[in-house]
């Protein structure tokens, strides 16, 4: 039919998808294969990287990224946070993207996943062959021999070594010399024979270890010019930023810890050095290059700093926190190079699982029908007689030596789990990888054949455990992670032999191989070799089928499958789960205090997006808690009886466990009027309820993840623990499930008879507090070898208990960039950088040295029963320094410091006294939404247009010792938007000394905005509102720095001198080791205070000392408490640390935030007494 107006349209039988709706990303892998992914045009580089990681079943994607060639034919790394298509359209020479290593590690033994090491090996080999990593001829031949062994296997598998002529042996720059190539091939052939017997992973490891010792390893450079105009190459390496001169001058390396800041301006890239107070500039080709170099160097700086602090605590952390999987394991020798996941990226975190992934699956019936529960049993490697391990590899008899090293716990994705991802050559059923020809079988990330091919081979009887053809290596689908990986909603459960009738004969004889499908609700009653095999291109849920018939035809499998959308690349999740606690301990699931204080290091990825998981977890735990199976054998669970074996004689006997919740409550009053103070009025009649004003602890599972860490000593006592636990479980139910709430006893306090006084808010003193002022202190002095039969271990308040009201995101969008608090948003630690468990419990030998109370406190437990009155020992005013020192040391050794600390209220009993701080307009002025000043103790500013309530997160703290008044202001580290308020407070309160107890940035996280100008910089003056700040001088004294500042009021012209004393030796985790250095810092504060008091105006003879850290409670409290207690020692006053701390916390909540900080105060006082004896 002709068209009107003579229009003619081209007729075709095809249509094209609009380029505006999708993007076909073509990515070249490190083995030179290409994969294509269909993505949205808005898909970021991160999503593309995750797609590659899914294809490779790679979890440790932190080290990898994507790059492309720009229009100047230069390599440029993709910005993972921006859409990939826009970057390629704007900058790329071609649409091809390349996968590679962006962050190099100091030691390749720290890479945990086998696929990670293999990809890392391919990257290093590519760097050598392409000439990016310079090497000598001897080094190239040595590496070539290892590469041939890794890629081709033993030399005796081939008739001759002629194939080496076609193999790329040497770097590309030497390929033109044929004579050199021939000689090199002969030497490589000899090396190939020498390396006979090495498996592919072993040869690859030797190759990588050889490369990491070469000059230029991990370097990436760019051309630039220095300040003299000389041509240089600048780039990042493992140690820092290097500068190589092309005129023969030796290279210069600016180490990461010496670099304070990096910036770029136009075409200039600048480094600010921390120790020299100077800035070094380099000129790049253009503005885009300067910005790119800055972005790359900043990323590497953060990566290596985070990993440096991780490596320092890795051994202790992995020995404690990672053992929260309610399992026993032996950690591998090399410690992983773990990086905490960046919070802004979903999956770009390296979540280290440094233990063997051997799993005995248990199928506990549940109501939802979707998720099974499995137990990880790590006291042995998961191997059956055919040499199959959990990652899907089949090892021959002479290659099982590699199984001695525990394999990392993987959560790989299937070969293609997205319907929009088309197949490629990798997905072909007849595809056989050509890069490995050794006895080592390719792991599960190698391509797998389809169902048809597998069944044909099965019918031909080709499956034998000792066969090694490439087609047979891929048959191990039943035990491969592509089909047995846990998704995000699979939780571990105890190893319960609840279905013995379902086990196969093989699993009956060899209980370490149950042949259970990870996702199916019923185990396969058949060996792995006889199971049906599902095609490779599928989602993981394709094996989540309940198969109980004798035969397993494929159509039945597909027909009964409930299809769901493919899950994203799995979140790194902690190995433990809360239902374990509900099952083993019969404790209410709302008691997160059973966790160790450093559990947040384990659950750093438990963020808001995983809250639905926790709610569904509560539902799962209900039928588990209700179950009563006395005959079940529970291995690797953390039992109450088994836990107390590690308490050095501190046991819970059956008569103790039968106590009800009422038995926990009241402490008795003695004749000496010594008493205890409860959080609220305790009901004496055994009731299960608390008063309305009670300081209770009730959180749902969406607030915290519960972990209990077993001790290694439990291994030898496993059977006894199980039997004792089976008897005591019903008794524990009555003791622990009372209204899901617990009373938390606070510290008893000393009489106010001495000259030590606290200015307390009159209107907020409760009855228990008034009674507390007329009683004597009770200090726990307990012999470690005597078992406590009448004390019931109860959960104690941990550092995670800031407030329950703090668990919410800020109301405004601008607050989303800043967490409510570090621990609440899922970051590494608590507000003050809570140290990992290893900071207190470093080795097994150290754990044996500590007493029962200390060990109990470290595990979040404390005795609710106070010792008898004669057990207490007061540090009297008449005691000599030697006697005081001895008493303090005795408290530390016997562990009474820990129970003493746990009894101190973290904040006032009555909540809601921070109304001004909780106003919506003041939310942006709080660094953390759960650390707020009380209304009657807060520092009030003169209201301004910008701050009409005159609010700042700061508190007055007033103490009187021997008639001398000590006045402090405790505040948080200034934010960028509160610097003006900070300096207004300094001016209005007449502050002359600022004591800063933190660095500006620790571990890549901002602790305090730099509110004063640098000395020696071009701009040594900064203006905040009406105040102009100028740096006059700076003196570095080792562990602290003294800076003189001039503060000028621009409206009146008045000037003042402000002293800035910054303690620079506080580690990111724990407390300072140099006690003398900290005491010298306190002496510097005293010295400057005396100087300022002597020169101050008469109207302000004693200006307050302003102390701040990050949140203004942890380290700030340590400084204030230490200085007050030192003053008590100097004036020979009663030394009552817990009472002083409790009264300090009545003026600002949660001062001295962690147990280690409280212990540090004791150590400071002991060191002060020892030093005073020498004077």
Curated annotation (Swiss-Prot):
<feature type="modified residue" description="Phosphoserine">
    <location>
        <position position="800"/>
    </location>
</feature>
<dbReference type="InterPro" id="IPR041782">
    <property type="entry name" value="PTPN14/21_FERM_C"/>
</dbReference>
<dbReference type="GO" id="GO:0007010">
    <property type="term" value="P:cytoskeleton organization"/>
</dbReference>
<dbReference type="InterPro" id="IPR003595">
    <property type="entry name" value="Tyr_Pase_cat"/>
</dbReference>
<feature type="region of interest" description="Disordered">
    <location>
        <begin position="395"/>
        <end position="445"/>
    </location>
</feature>
<dbReference type="InterPro" id="IPR029021">
    <property type="entry name" value="Prot-tyrosine_phosphatase-like"/>
</dbReference>
<comment type="similarity">
    <text>Belongs to the protein-tyrosine phosphatase family. Non-receptor class subfamily.</text>
</comment>
<feature type="modified residue" description="Phosphoserine">
    <location>
        <position position="673"/>
    </location>
</feature>
<keyword id="KW-0206">Cytoskeleton</keyword>
<feature type="modified residue" description="Phosphoserine">
    <location>
        <position position="589"/>
    </location>
</feature>
<feature type="modified residue" description="Phosphoserine">
    <location>
        <position position="805"/>
    </location>
</feature>
<dbReference type="InterPro" id="IPR035963">
    <property type="entry name" value="FERM_2"/>
</dbReference>
<dbReference type="GO" id="GO:0004725">
    <property type="term" value="F:protein tyrosine phosphatase activity"/>
</dbReference>
<feature type="modified residue" description="Phosphoserine">
    <location>
        <position position="710"/>
    </location>
</feature>
<protein>
    <recommendedName>
        <fullName>Tyrosine-protein phosphatase non-receptor type 21</fullName>
        <ecNumber>3.1.3.48</ecNumber>
    </recommendedName>
</protein>
<feature type="active site" description="Phosphocysteine intermediate">
    <location>
        <position position="1109"/>
    </location>
</feature>
<dbReference type="InterPro" id="IPR014392">
    <property type="entry name" value="PTP_non-rcpt_14/21"/>
</dbReference>
<keyword id="KW-0597">Phosphoprotein</keyword>
<dbReference type="InterPro" id="IPR019749">
    <property type="entry name" value="Band_41_domain"/>
</dbReference>
<dbReference type="InterPro" id="IPR000242">
    <property type="entry name" value="PTP_cat"/>
</dbReference>
<feature type="compositionally biased region" description="Polar residues">
    <location>
        <begin position="395"/>
        <end position="421"/>
    </location>
</feature>
<dbReference type="Pfam" id="PF00373">
    <property type="entry name" value="FERM_M"/>
</dbReference>
<dbReference type="InterPro" id="IPR019747">
    <property type="entry name" value="FERM_CS"/>
</dbReference>
<keyword id="KW-0904">Protein phosphatase</keyword>
<dbReference type="GO" id="GO:0005856">
    <property type="term" value="C:cytoskeleton"/>
</dbReference>
<keyword id="KW-0378">Hydrolase</keyword>
<keyword id="KW-0963">Cytoplasm</keyword>
<feature type="region of interest" description="Disordered">
    <location>
        <begin position="663"/>
        <end position="702"/>
    </location>
</feature>
<dbReference type="InterPro" id="IPR018980">
    <property type="entry name" value="FERM_PH-like_C"/>
</dbReference>
<feature type="modified residue" description="Phosphoserine">
    <location>
        <position position="637"/>
    </location>
</feature>
<dbReference type="Pfam" id="PF00102">
    <property type="entry name" value="Y_phosphatase"/>
</dbReference>
<dbReference type="InterPro" id="IPR000387">
    <property type="entry name" value="Tyr_Pase_dom"/>
</dbReference>
<dbReference type="Pfam" id="PF09380">
    <property type="entry name" value="FERM_C"/>
</dbReference>
<dbReference type="InterPro" id="IPR011993">
    <property type="entry name" value="PH-like_dom_sf"/>
</dbReference>
<dbReference type="InterPro" id="IPR016130">
    <property type="entry name" value="Tyr_Pase_AS"/>
</dbReference>
<dbReference type="Pfam" id="PF09379">
    <property type="entry name" value="FERM_N"/>
</dbReference>
<feature type="modified residue" description="Phosphoserine">
    <location>
        <position position="590"/>
    </location>
</feature>
<feature type="domain" description="FERM">
    <location>
        <begin position="23"/>
        <end position="308"/>
    </location>
</feature>
<dbReference type="GO" id="GO:0005737">
    <property type="term" value="C:cytoplasm"/>
</dbReference>
<feature type="binding site">
    <location>
        <position position="1068"/>
    </location>
    <ligand>
        <name>substrate</name>
    </ligand>
</feature>
<feature type="domain" description="Tyrosine-protein phosphatase">
    <location>
        <begin position="897"/>
        <end position="1168"/>
    </location>
</feature>
<dbReference type="InterPro" id="IPR019748">
    <property type="entry name" value="FERM_central"/>
</dbReference>
